[in-house]
Amino acid sequence: MLKNIRFIFIFAVLCSACGQDSPKQGGGKFGMLDSGNPEFTAVEFFDHIYHSEGIDGAIKVSTPKMKRLLRSYHTNKGVQKHVLNMRFDKVTIQPRSRSAGRNEFAKEAQISIFFEGELDGDIFKDMRNVELLKVGNDWKVDEVSLE
């Protein structure tokens, strides 16, 4: 009887040790793309514009100034063509911070976003600079520019 209980206990311990790992927090190298960082918000903004069905996700991470601009173009294609002047069929988005400091403690940040993608079979590479403001605990996209 004692052997059966010992066997069941060992079996239960082994089964519980083989459970799923908890999901990783953040993304990128060393979790740099955690949701509290401006790089994460900048990538999320463009990801909603290029990989989502609508612009609602991009509007959620925008300041009121950017929200008005995005809403005036109604669709992802309109925003891509008129606001960003970059259309892609497929695109990869990579951030690069303009400061060496810790942006998550700042009130504003400037992030360079690099795009590499396809449009009608041609490969294009481009870059945009994004200015973000910290509103409460969240980063919001305020402006997108070429410079």
Annotate each predicted stretch with a short phrase:
Residues 1-16:
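Sec-dependent bacterial lipoprotein signal peptides
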Residues 14-17, 53, 97:
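N-terminal regions of proteins, emphasizing targeting and processing segments when present
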Residues 18-51:
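Short, low-complexity N-terminal intrinsically disordered segments enriched in polar/charged residues
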Residues 44-52, 61-69, 135-138:
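Structured segments of extracytoplasmic/periplasmic soluble domains
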Residues 55-106:
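Short solvent-exposed beta->alpha transition segments
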Residues 99-147:
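Exposed beta-sheet edge and beta->alpha loop/turn motif
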